[in-house]
Amino acid sequence: TIKTKDKDGQHMNNMDLGYEMFCYQCEQTANGKGCTKLGVCGKTPEIANLQDLLIFQIKGISCYGKVLQNEGHHIDKNIIRFIENVLFTTLTNVNFDSKVHVELLNESQRIKENLRTITGEIHNQTSYATYDLPETKTQMLKDAQFAGIMYDKSLDPDIRSLRQTILYGLKGISAYGHQARELGY
């Protein structure tokens, strides 16, 4: 399970705020503040939460990838392609198929475990790096509540916004990469 606690040692997550989901990725968000029960675009809480967990997982993969890069290794193009695909898949209105999301989550865990084997224990032992994905979708959805945008109530809103802006920029770049790959470039 993902361990995330506030300064008093209490767990925090999107659900603590009374949200089934939280998404403010697009201009369609409810009242311009974010969708919390169902996306205006049709995104369900299940998909939103699986997407949050996918992003959490690729952050973990990146912890190991950074170690390999620092040691002078090149990252396998299949891993880069996978991360690009996850970023593209989590864009608004791209893919709302929970089966695909669970398959991507399982693949993310295989990649992370493979990178762990290569790197051994790393210095950056964040919850992103140490988290192990459970086997069932039900448990994944329980864990996803700790991977959401609003999980850390103590995080400065400007820092949260900056992190999300960077993430959305990466998602946009991945869309171009994905389309170029589809066209054979």
Pin down the residues of each PLM region.
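Metallocofactor- and cofactor-centric catalytic cores in central/energy metabolism, strongly enriched
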Residues: 13-185
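Short, Lys/Arg-enriched N-terminal segments with co-localized hydrophobic residues
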Residues: 1-12
